[in-house]
């Protein structure tokens, strides 16, 4: 199994930033720090063995308003590294003893993600073999042994009393060979048709293993997972590996279902868990959003909000051992959190990073302030990234065979209005572009394809933008456009 970090071992920090630049505009300091953190993982893997366990990740805390790219930076970094990644909100956790989710659950969820990720990779490795086995199962259904293309009814003409006594042994062998040869030729014809897709629309009845997930969900809230009990494995063993049920589907659907089943049988689940646990421990990334929401408790306690203050500070204290490095029991096994990279973020409007408890502050040694986005940034966000909004809408309408062209002046006007609305109402960063662009294209998206038929070309210029968004730009009461 490839090492979890091998996908980025050839990328220098500068190249990692260049990759992030394809999707995220600005915020160079934040990109630089996460690139260093990612490269340091590979450096640690190649450090002398006696020092490897001593080198801890430099956790990062990103400070900035909503919509400036904090989450996107972490998400793109995880995709680049092919690493298990989870985003959690600190405000959703509660102190141990209170009703709600405890902080350990983030590591359990991260491990589940890693298991699914590794399982998918293992299945891809055996995909060709799984498809072959699935095809054989479909052929067994299409031409079962008793109806394999040659009718044994032909034998019935000689089934009179005593006929078997007159058959020589050589004749019997020849008939068996002919029957086997005919069966194989018939099977090969059907196999060729199956591979060409000629039988895709034909309906067949297949046997599949029923999913025990619904039973898992019944027991989920009872804390079995917290005790490290793998319910899926438990019920699988008790039920003999899952109940079988019959389904009537097309051959095309059957191929997909049976390929998945065969791939599941071919992979080694113990190896999957072992690889997944290793990947979580060596390459996992946890993004803790809204960390500022639990920081404010240190002050509200003195201001009379004692209950809330204690609870928020309790979440910080529960978070501390996980960030420092501890063992968390999951249903897949024990996970050591020592080398998991934690990236925290928050707006820190009502509080500041120093409001976090000192021990937790010390576990996030790198602090990065992200800049507010201005009109120029919005213009670049609309046009430069590989997944830019303008490109997304172009692709959407391309599906209707309608060409949409954004003139440079039209995009500039969009950026100006988005920046103005952010300044006048509430700054929600790049998320404002979604609202403005959706409002601009609302009628267009509704009119396609009846009013605007396939083959049409639509041009978005500055005049159209001003005309359709004038009410947003001029009105001070913009509450209906706030996300």
For each feature predicted by the language model, list its residue ranges.
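Non-catalytic accessory segments flanking P-loop/AAA+ NTPase cores
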Residues: 1-483
């Amino acid at each position: 199994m490839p090492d979890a970090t091998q996908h980025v071992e050839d990328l220098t920090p500068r190249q990692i930033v260049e990759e992030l630049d394809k999707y995220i505009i600005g915020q160079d300091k934040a990109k630089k720090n996460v690139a260093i953190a990612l490269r340091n993982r590979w450096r640690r893997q190649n450090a002398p063995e006696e020092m490897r366990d001593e080198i801890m990740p430099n956790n990062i805390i990103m400070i900035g308003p909503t919509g400036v790219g904090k989450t996107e930076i972490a998400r793109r970094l995880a995709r680049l590294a092919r690493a298990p990644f989870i985003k959690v909100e600190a405000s959703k956790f509660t102190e141990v003893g209170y009703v709600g989710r405890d902080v350990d659950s983030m590591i359990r969820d991260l491990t589940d993600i890693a298991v699914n990720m590794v399982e998918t990779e293992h299945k891809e490795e055996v995909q060709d073999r799984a498809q072959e086995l699935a095809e054989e199962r479909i052929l067994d259904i299409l031409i079962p042994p008793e109806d394999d293309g040659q009718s044994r009814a032909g034998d019935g003409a000689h089934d009179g009393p005593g006929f078997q006594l007159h058959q020589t042994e050589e004749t019997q062998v020849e008939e068996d060979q002919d029957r086997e040869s005919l069966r194989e030729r018939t099977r090969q014809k059907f196999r060729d048709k199956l591979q060409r897709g000629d039988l895709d629309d034909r309906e067949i009845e297949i046997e599949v293993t029923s999913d025990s997930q619904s039973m898992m969900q019944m027991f989920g809230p009872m804390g079995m997972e917290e005790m490290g009990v793998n319910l899926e494995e438990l019920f699988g063993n008790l039920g003999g590996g899952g109940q079988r049920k019959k389904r009537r589907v097309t051959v095309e659907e059957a191929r997909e279902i049976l390929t998945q089943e065969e791939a599941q049988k071919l992979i080694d689940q113990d190896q999957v868990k072992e690889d997944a646990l290793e990947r979580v421990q060596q390459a996992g990334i946890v993004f803790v959003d809204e960390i500022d929401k639990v920081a404010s408790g240190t002050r509200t306690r003195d201001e009379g909000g004692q209950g809330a203050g204690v609870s928020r500070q309790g979440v910080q204290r529960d978070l501390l051992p996980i960030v420092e490095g501890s063992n968390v029991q999951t249903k897949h096994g024990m996970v050591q959190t020592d080398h998991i990279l934690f990236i925290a973020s928050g707006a820190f409007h009502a509080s500041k990073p120093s409001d976090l408890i000192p021990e937790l502050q010390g576990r996030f040694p790198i602090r990065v302030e992200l800049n507010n986005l201005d009109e120029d940034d919005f213009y670049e966000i609309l046009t430069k990234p590989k997944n830019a909004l303008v490109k997304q809408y172009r692709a959407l309408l391309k599906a209707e065979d309608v060409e949409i062209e954004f003139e440079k002046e039209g995009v500039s006007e969009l950026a100006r209005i988005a920046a103005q609305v952010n300044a006048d109402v509430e700054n929600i960063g790049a998320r404002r572009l979604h609202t403005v662009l959706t409002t601009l294209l609302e009628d267009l998206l509704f009119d396609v394809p009846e009013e605007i038929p396939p083959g049409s070309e639509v041009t978005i210029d500055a005049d159209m933008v001003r005309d359709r968004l004038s009410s947003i730009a001029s009105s001070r009461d913009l509450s209906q456009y706030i996300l």
